[in-house]
């Protein structure tokens, strides 16, 4: 009977206890790798953030250049009624009282200067 017990201990208990030790070692190795991976991810994240900030700065610079050179928007064209107090006529146009054909409307229109 003793040989059966010894055999049982050798065959079943010893591998289980060694397997648990390996499991603990594997767990420690995984923790080390994840810590290394986190530091690598932090580095990669910072690098990506720097690149995105540079790209954003370039895009904002281009937008400001476009806004300086772009044409006037939301203005009233020629022959369109306008408000005498708040004229929004496009550049090159003036808000004037109509002559002849538009007198009966009692309104101001955008005309060329």
UniProtKB/Swiss-Prot annotation:
Residues 60-69 have a biased composition (Basic and acidic residues). Residues 60-83 are annotated as: Disordered. GO terms for molecular function: sodium channel inhibitor activity; toxin activity. Keywords: Disulfide bond, Ion channel impairing toxin, Knottin, Secreted, Signal, Toxin. GO terms for cellular component: extracellular region. Disulfide bonds join 75-90, 82-95, 89-110. It is found in: Secreted. Expressed by the venom gland. The keyword Secreted applies. The keyword Manganese does not apply. Residues 1-21 form the signal peptide. Pfam families: Toxin_22 (PF08092). Residues 22-74 form a propeptide. Its main location: secreted. Belongs to the neurotoxin 14 (magi-1) family. 01 (HNTX-16) subfamily. Probable ion channel inhibitor. The presence of a 'disulfide through disulfide knot' structurally defines this protein as a knottin. This is U11-theraphotoxin-Hhn1a.
């Amino acid at each position: 009977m003793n040989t059966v017990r010894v055999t049982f201990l050798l065959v079943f208990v010893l591998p289980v206890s060694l397997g648990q030790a390996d499991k603990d070692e594997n767990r420690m190795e995984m923790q080390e790798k994840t810590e290394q991976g986190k530091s690598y991810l932090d580095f990669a994240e910072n690098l990506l953030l720097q690149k995105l900030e540079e790209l954003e700065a370039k895009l904002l610079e281009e937008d400001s250049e476009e806004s300086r050179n772009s044409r006037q928007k939301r203005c009233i064209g020629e022959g369109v009624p306008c408000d005498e107090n708040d004229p929004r006529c496009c550049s090159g146009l003036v808000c004037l009282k109509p002559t002849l054909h538009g007198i009966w409307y009692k309104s101001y229109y955008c005309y060329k200067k």
